């Protein structure tokens, strides 16, 4: 049976009212306050059998999902993956998403996998492209009590990962208290920093508090970076910060936002990323928002040149055993891979090579493209909720939610989020053959046209679709 036909059968299984009801019942709590699904996944992992309709439903969903999208060969590996608490959290969110939304293209998780939270707008730099217009903290930024409650709500909703950003998050005095609260819930915690405050002491402290991932911004050579960031003398501090994080063996990424001011420097930064032995080089898709001007945005041709360069670097078989992976937040990066006859889920979460497995390849249509409103949300420092940090459209405020039930109700039913999840609603990108693996950047559409369903003007294909 073809994968598309198997996916249809799987979808019918999920849409069965009895199946759907049993899936949602898995998210009730037992007498110990644990989700029933957590107990059942533990039993599934151990190969145990439980005589209950809920367990049999979960087992059927997992077995049929694996068969449809991976094949039986992956079943035993899958059980090994379940030993990882983060993988287990992610799976629980997937199952909840099936109960809420069914087998959608693109897929929507039961709660955001990732929330990017600008915990403060205090910053020691003056970057020319800052989406947050950072510098001084807002007067109404969440206090410690409000921030801790926010983490409780997100964690209890099933959010897997939280990224503390800004501003410069290290300028928030209670940051490590917030990190500890998130780690108490076994959440993945990352920090997005400009690197200038990452001295040996702070890098060691991040390690001690079990931060999983640190992303540091670097936008070019010394001259370019300091011009871009608005302060002379900070390039060396940034490089030192990167080295300190790598020395602490924390997963480290260099993030470069490509504009007309620095895109010729990008290959040099990519080479430097390898020399510094970081795990990721992340090419950020520039979006004119905050203090960022439209006139420094790349043309579609310049952006295409960079994405192809990134792809070549990722697949360069020179015999060198660098560990650096090359990623981009541009949703068209997956389309770049397909144009090179490769099935790759290329995103700002990870690069996933789907290889030659036809069933795995079909996943690209379900989980590829922009995750905005499907896999992640953003929070401003005052608790305002946005689809993405580059997408300044207020959807609500976290302080208005009493608990995780209110948050999950918002996640399920917010009109704008549901618009973003429906690629058939896209006015130009919706007619593109790559709409499921890409779909364009909704933040760029909103920035340019004040309409998040319009085309992404940064994509080289849009001129042929009008």
Swiss-Prot record:
Keywords: 4Fe-4S, Iron, Iron-sulfur, Lipid metabolism, Metal-binding, Oxidoreductase, S-adenosyl-L-methionine. Contains four domains, including an N-terminal domain comprised of six helices, a conserved radical SAM domain (RS-domain), a bridging region with two helices and a beta-hairpin motif, and a C-terminal SPASM domain. Belongs to the radical SAM superfamily. The keyword Protease does not apply. Changing residue 370 to A: Contains only the radical SAM 4Fe-4S cluster. Contains only the 4Fe-4S cluster 3. The keyword S-adenosyl-L-methionine applies. This is GMGT synthase. It comes from the Archaea. It catalyses: GDGT-0 + AH2 + 2 S-adenosyl-L-methionine = GMGT-0 + 2 5'-deoxyadenosine + 2 L-methionine + A + 2 H(+). Binds 3 [4Fe-4S] clusters. The first cluster is coordinated with 3 cysteines and an exchangeable S-adenosyl-L-methionine. [4Fe-4S] cluster 2 binds at residues 370, 372, 388, 441. The gene is gms. Its cofactor is [4Fe-4S] cluster. Its EC number is 1.-.-.-. Residues 100-317 form the Radical SAM core domain.
């Amino acid at each position: 049976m073809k994968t598309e036909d198997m996916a249809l059968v799987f979808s019918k299984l999920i849409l069965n009212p009895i199946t759907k009801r049993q899936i949602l019942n898995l998210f009730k709590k037992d007498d110990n306050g644990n989700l029933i699904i957590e107990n059942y996944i533990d039993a599934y992992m151990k190969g145990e059998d439980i005589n209950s309709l809920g367990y049999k439903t979960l087992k059927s969903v997992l077995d049929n999902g694996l068969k449809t999208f991976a094949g039986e060969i992956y079943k035993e590996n899958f059980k090994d993956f379940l030993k990882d608490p983060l993988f287990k959290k992610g799976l629980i969110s997937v199952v909840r998403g099936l109960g809420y939304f069914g087998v959608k293209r693109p897929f929507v998780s039961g709660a955001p996998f990732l929330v990017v939270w600008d915990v403060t707008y205090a910053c020691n730099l003056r970057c020319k492209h800052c989406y947050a217009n950072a510098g001084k903290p807002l007067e109404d930024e969440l206090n410690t009590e409000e921030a801790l409650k926010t983490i409780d709500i997100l964690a209890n909703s099933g959010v897997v990962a939280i990224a503390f950003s800004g501003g410069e998050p290290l300028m928030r005095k209670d940051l490590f208290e917030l990190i500890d609260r998130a780690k108490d819930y076994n959440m993945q915690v990352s920090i997005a920093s400009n690197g200038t405050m990452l001295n040996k002491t702070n890098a060691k402290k991040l390690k001690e508090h079990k931060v999983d991932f640190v992303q540091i911004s670097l936008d070019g050579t010394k001259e370019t970076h300091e011009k871009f960031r608005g302060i002379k003398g900070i390039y060396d501090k940034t490089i030192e910060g990167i080295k300190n994080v790598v020395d602490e063996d924390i997963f480290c990424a260099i993030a470069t936002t490509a504009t007309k001011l620095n895109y010729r420097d990008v290959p040099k930064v990519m080479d430097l990323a390898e020399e510094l032995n970081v795990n990721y080089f992340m090419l950020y898709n520039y979006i004119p928002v905050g203090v960022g001007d439209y006139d420094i945005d790349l043309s579609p041709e310049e952006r295409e040149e960079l994405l192809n360069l990134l792809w070549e670097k990722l697949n360069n078989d020179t015999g060198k055993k660098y560990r650096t992976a090359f990623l981009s937040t541009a949703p068209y990066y997956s389309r770049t891979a397909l144009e090179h006859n490769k099935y790759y889920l290329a995103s700002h979460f990870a690069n996933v090579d789907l290889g030659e497995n036809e069933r795995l390849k079909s996943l690209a249509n379900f989980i590829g493209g922009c995750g905005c409103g499907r896999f992640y949300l953003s929070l401003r420092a005052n608790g305002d909720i946005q689809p993405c940090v580059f997408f300044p459209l207020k959807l609500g405020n976290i302080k208005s939610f009493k608990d995780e039930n209110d948050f999950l109700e918002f996640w399920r039913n917010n009109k704008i989020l549901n618009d973003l999840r429906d690629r058939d609603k896209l006015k130009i990108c919706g007619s593109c053959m790559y709409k499921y693996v890409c779909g364009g950047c909704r933040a760029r559409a909103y920035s340019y046209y004040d309409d998040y369903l319009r085309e992404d003007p940064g994509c080289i294909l849009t001129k042929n679709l009008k």
